[in-house]
């Protein structure tokens, strides 16, 4: 029998339909692979008993020719999504052993469609990070290594566990979230596909909040087709989320293989940065050539406020985080540190419960919202955000269908390489991705090549609002030209 963990999600779905193997066999293969790959630290909680029970139920549905589009397919869940009765911590000490009494909308829709939960995946604490090094469970290790080196690399963040697990073949796909690039950047670092939908396309209800006006759930998968299949189940209107958009969910998989002839692709001149590595520049040109060969038209465009996106993001996001994280006080749930009075208890709980990066962002956020600084920082950042959004609107009104950019300014770096230096060095990893969040647009990262050391590099496509289908079709063109990227097993 084929190694079941090497299948794409679409191949596994088709194999189950043909009864080439059972959902239980597929799940057991992934559970065994998870055991072998524990050194990667991708999972913070494995749920084998629940997974096998869900797989048996899926097999029962298959026997009756019933079941949803994800029936029997084993997935990993980022530890930011509430899973009823199953520990959910956002990878922070402050949530302790918290077991939610409810299920997030996104995961409930996956289970509705028959998916199997393998466990909870590691992420940066409260999704604050670009390398998955801020988790209270320790860093995630990228399954990729530089040629001839055994230096352990980061998988990107904050959805590092999701990306690492998909790349290593220890789940068929994974849920993730993207606030400033947390789906697309780790996908680029691990040779996987990361799809951030339009803001409001997937419900945020039951997902631990970082920055509410920026957070958006989406999938990380091995192929563009797999990401499209997962997004169809994850998306949809939810009356419990006031930012959820009541709009029909299309069949995203139907966009895979659709002709891109005549589509107009913008190449933003502002993304050509000083000091950009030549291999990133070359990859970008190669991606443009692939799209042109498929019949797309290339045009240079201008997004003049791009240079302000990163500083504006690092004002807006911490400001919202400082408000969202005020609820963690040790009173009703999560970890609690004792104090001689209630104020001291609050202070001790938050000081011991939050990690250094989360504390840093809470302090930045509290500062920019404080009297005397609100207008100078937060209000100005929101005005910049409006201008960034208008830049994209102007491009799309001029007939551009999607914008092609690099996904990251470099390949994956070593664990500890950037955490010990200036935190701004780490923040610069989001330079190509934050604009899509600030404007609420859909974006996809697709593996497109390798650097000189054999590490995967990705390209990003940013689409019109609610036109995920365009970036799926275009992303699949790049995928077909570049081929699949799979790391050699060393673990």
Curated annotation (Swiss-Prot):
Catalytic site positions: 78, 158, 182
Domain of life the protein comes from: Bacteria
Gene Ontology cellular component annotations, sorted alphabetically: glutamyl-tRNA(Gln) amidotransferase complex
Intrachain disulfide bonds: none
EC class name: ligase
Keyword terms of this UniProt record: ATP-binding, Ligase, Nucleotide-binding, Protein biosynthesis
Catalysed reaction, written as an equation: L-glutamyl-tRNA(Gln) + L-glutamine + ATP + H2O = L-glutaminyl-tRNA(Gln) + L-glutamate + ADP + phosphate + H(+)
PANTHER family the record matches: GLUTAMYL-TRNA(GLN) AMIDOTRANSFERASE SUBUNIT A (PTHR11895:SF151), TRANSAMIDASE (PTHR11895)
Protein name (Swiss-Prot/TrEMBL): Glutamyl-tRNA(Gln) amidotransferase subunit A
Species for this entry: Nitrobacter winogradskyi (strain ATCC 25391 / DSM 10237 / CIP 104748 / NCIMB 11846 / Nb-255)
């Amino acid at each position: 029998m084929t190694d079941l963990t090497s299948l794409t999600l679409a191949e596994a779905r088709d194999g189950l339909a043909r009864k080439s193997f059972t959902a239980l066999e597929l799940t057991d293969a992934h559970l065994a692979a998870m055991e072998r790959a524990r050194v990667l630290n991708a999972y913070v909680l494995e749920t084998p008993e629940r997974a096998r029970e869900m797989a048996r139920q899926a097999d029962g549905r298959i026997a009756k020719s019933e079941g949803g589009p994800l029936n029997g397919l084993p997935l990993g869940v980022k530890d930011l999504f509430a899973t009823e009765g199953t520990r959910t911590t956002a990878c922070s000490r402050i949530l302790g052993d918290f077991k939610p009494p409810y299920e997030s909308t996104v995961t409930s829709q996956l289970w509705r469609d028959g998916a199997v939960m393998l466990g909870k995946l590691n992420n940066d604490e409260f999704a604050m990070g670009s390398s998955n090094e801020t988790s209270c469970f320790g860093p995630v290790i990228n399954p990729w290594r530089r040629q001839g080196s055994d230096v352990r690399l980061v998988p990107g963040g904050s959805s590092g566990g999701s990306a690492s697990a998909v790349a290593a073949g220890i789940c068929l796909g994974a849920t993730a979230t993207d606030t400033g690039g947390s789906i697309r950047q780790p996908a680029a670092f691990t040779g996987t596909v990361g799809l951030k939908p339009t803001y409001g396309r997937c419900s945020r209800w039951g997902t631990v909040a970082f920055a509410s006006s920026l957070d958006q759930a989406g999938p990380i998968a091995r192929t563009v087709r797999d990401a499209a299949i997962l997004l169809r189940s994850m998306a949809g209107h939810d009356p419990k989320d006031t930012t959820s958009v009541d709009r029909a969910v299309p069949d995203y998989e139907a966009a895979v293989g659709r002709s891109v002839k005549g589509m107009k692709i913008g190449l933003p001149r502002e993304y050509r940065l000083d000091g950009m590595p030549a291999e990133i520049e070359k990859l970008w040109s190669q991606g443009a050539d692939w799209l042109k060969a498929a019949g797309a038209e290339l045009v240079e465009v201008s997004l003049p406020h791009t240079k302000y996106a990163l500083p504006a993001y690092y004002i807006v996001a911490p400001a919202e985080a400082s408000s969202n994280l005020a609820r963690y006080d040790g009173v009703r749930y999560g970890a609690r540190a004792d104090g001689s009075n209630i104020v001291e208890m609050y202070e001790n709980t938050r000081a011991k419960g939050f990690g250094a990066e989360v504390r840093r962002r809470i302090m930045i956020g509290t500062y920019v919202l404080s009297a005397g600084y609100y207008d100078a920082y937060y209000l100005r950042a929101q005005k910049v955000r409006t201008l960034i959004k208008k830049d994209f609107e102007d491009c799309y009104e001029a007939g551009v269908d999607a914008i092609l950019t690099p996904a990251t300014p470099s390949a994956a770096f070593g664990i500890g390489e950037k955490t010990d230096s200036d935190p701004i060095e780490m923040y610069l990893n989001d330079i190509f991705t934050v604009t899509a969040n600030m404007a609420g647009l859909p974006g996809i990262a697709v593996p497109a090549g390798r650097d000189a050391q054999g590490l995967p590099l990705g390209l990003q496509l940013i689409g019109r609002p609610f036109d995920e289908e365009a970036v799926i079709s275009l992303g699949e063109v790049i995928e077909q030209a570049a081929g699949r990227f799979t790391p050699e097993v060393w673990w």
